[in-house]
A protein has these predicted regions:
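Conserved ABC ATPase signature
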Residues: 128-132, 136
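Helix-to-loop junction immediately C-terminal to a conserved catalytic motif
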Residues: 53
Length: 262
């Protein structure tokens, strides 16, 4: 499944209070691509994902899907906040989307348990979310998104609230699951290292109103792991991205706008 954003813009409010958050966003994903989206705080990254997910209407432009995904929905969105249901146990949380699609009980539980095994949580299947750590709850959200079998997976800083060690583990787990299933992924992050480690390309956004500054191919072979971050190839690319995006971060920090991330 491929996705194209054609000239997406978004304005919140009206008249003198109108705020342009996104302006002329145009890009295409490739089949099975992992696309990292990187930009300063408040540039509209989360707004863009919500438009792609159909949760927000763009002020202008359109989102176009092409290709077939008969086994599942068009997209699934994983937020920074895990968004799991506290009254359901772990297995029922993962199986929820399949239940809504009418998948028979045994089939949905078998599929959900398989993904819980992949994220190391099968032994917690009957536990309630409050019994688990924040990192474990985010693993539940990731397992639920993949088992739902979306054509395109949208991830809005899913590791942003985690401690550094847990973040590294989940990055590695995500890479392994993605490698097995090759879903098209659009992954929003503030972290340059994360964008390079995970992505096939890195889409850089300007400060608000968010525009595409450039799209940089990563060009580092797979499979990847944390050790690649010490290679000259990785460090050179990291500096290349930082040199491109630094001025946008400085604009955001200086308060050239009063935007916030919607």
């Amino acid at each position: 499944m491929r996705l194209e954003c054609r000239c997406i813009s978004k304005i919140f409010g009206e008249g003198k209070k109108a705020t342009r958050t996104l302006d002329d966003i145009c890009f295409e994903t490739r089949e099975g691509e992992f696309l990292s989206v990187l930009g300063p705080s408040g540039c509209g990254k989360s707004t863009l994902l919500r438009i792609i997910a159909g949760l927000l209407e763009p002020t202008g432009g359109e989102v176009i899907y092409s290709g077939n995904n008969p086994a599942g929905p068009l997209n699934a969105l994983v937020f920074q906040e895990h968004g799991i249901f506290p009254w359901m146990n772990v297995l029922d949380n993962v199986a929820f989307g399949l239940e809504m699609r009418g998948v028979p009980r045994k089939e949905r539980y078998d599929q959900s348990l398989d993904f819980l095994k992949r994220v190391g949580l099968a032994q917690y299947a009957t536990r309630n979310p409050h019994e688990l750590s924040v990192g474990m709850r985010q693993r539940i959200a990731i397992a639920r998104a993949f088992v739902h079998n979306p054509a395109i997976l949208l991830m809005d800083e899913p590791f942003g609230a985690l401690d550094a060690q847990t973040r590294l583990i989940l990055q590695d787990e995500l890479l392994k699951i993605w490698s097995d299933h090759k879903k098209t992924v659009i992954f929003v992050t503030h972290d340059i290292d994360e964008a390079i480690l995970l992505g096939d390309r890195v889409l850089l956004m300007t400060s608000v109103p968010g525009r595409i500054k450039e799209v940089i191919p990563v060009g580092i072979g797979r499979p990847r792991d944390l050790r690649m971050e010490n290679t000259q190839e990785f460090l050179t690319l990291k500096m290349r991205i930082w040199e491109s995006i630094r001025s946008e971060v400085e604009k955001s920090m200086m308060g050239d706008n009063d935007e916030r991330e919607y």
